[in-house]
């Protein structure tokens, strides 16, 4: 396990830096940030992605299942002298807004959809649109399942944390190796849940179509923009030809960015 997964302040700062240098620029042609802009992040963790939006004067809200992460988000924002509303709840069961003023101009969903298991994915996607304003935008980013560390094995403490593609092994063998590596049972269960989720580019785009979203922009990254913070590597897009080959492209896409709107 890398130190950043244990030092949550460092983790928060790195997410904020990537959001500041990459996500806001990615959104600029489609969204002007003002003090009236309402931003919701689903699966916000400690809130690092939201910090630059709060710095720009936006009204930000974060939702997360993990109560500890919500407490940390509140602490980090308070330390930064910024306002943000953070709520510990399950988004799928969250009450839908009833007025346009309660809805959001931007919904961020970053490194979340790969954690949602198959039976719940469609419900999750369908539940997003009621939270979005008529001209609002959704920004979703996720690592393709078959990429070298698409199983999130880097969160492990033992030898498996450094082995690429190990998550693609059959489940019984993968489970045995996780146990041999000395991983905690709760971590093993989390990794097996991600394996059951197995979010590919193709499945994601199918979900978008079936739940009523229109694609505005799509970028497949060979080197994830966040790797600049983690490993000092410059972001690189996946070559266009490679990005057009279904299934095969998942092995090379360390992050996929999508901007979506609701079909009206």
Residue locations for each model-derived region?
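Conserved N-terminal segment of class I S-adenosyl-L-methionine
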Residues: 1-102, 106, 122, 253-257
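Active-site beta-strand termini and strand-to-loop segments that position acidic
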Residues: 260-263
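Surface-exposed loop/turn positions
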Residues: 37, 135-136
């Amino acid at each position: 396990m890398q130190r950043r997964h244990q030092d949550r302040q460092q983790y928060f700062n790195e997410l904020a830096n990537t959001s500041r240098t990459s996500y806001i620029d990615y959104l600029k042609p489609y969204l002007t940030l003002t003090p009236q802009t309402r931003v919701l992040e689903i699966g916000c963790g400690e809130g690092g992605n939201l910090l630059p939006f709060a710095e720009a004067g936006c009204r930000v809200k974060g939702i997360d299942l993990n109560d500890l992460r919500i407490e940390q988000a509140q602490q980090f924002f308070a330390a930064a002298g910024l306002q943000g509303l953070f709520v510990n709840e399950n988004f799928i069961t969250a009450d839908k807004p009833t007025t346009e003023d309660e809805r959001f101009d931007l919904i961020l969903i970053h490194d979340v959809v790969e954690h949602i298991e198959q039976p719940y994915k469609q419900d999750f996607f369908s539940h997003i649109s009621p939270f979005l304003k008529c001209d609002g935008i959704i920004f979703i980013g996720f690592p393709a399942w078959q990429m070298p560390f698409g199983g999130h094995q880097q969160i492990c403490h033992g030898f498996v944390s450094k082995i690429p593609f190990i998550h693609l092994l059959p489940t019984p063998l993968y489970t045995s190796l996780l146990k041999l590596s000395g991983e905690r049972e709760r971590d093993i269960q989390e990794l097996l849940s991600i394996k059951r989720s197995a979010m590919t580019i193709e499945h994601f785009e199918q979900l978008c179509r079936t739940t009523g979203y229109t694609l505005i922009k799509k970028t497949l990254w060979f080197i994830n923009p966040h790797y600049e913070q983690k490993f000092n590597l410059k972001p690189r897009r996946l070559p266009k030809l490679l990005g057009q080959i279904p299934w095969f492209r998942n092995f090379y896409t360390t992050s996929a960015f999508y901007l979506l709107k609701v079909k009206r």
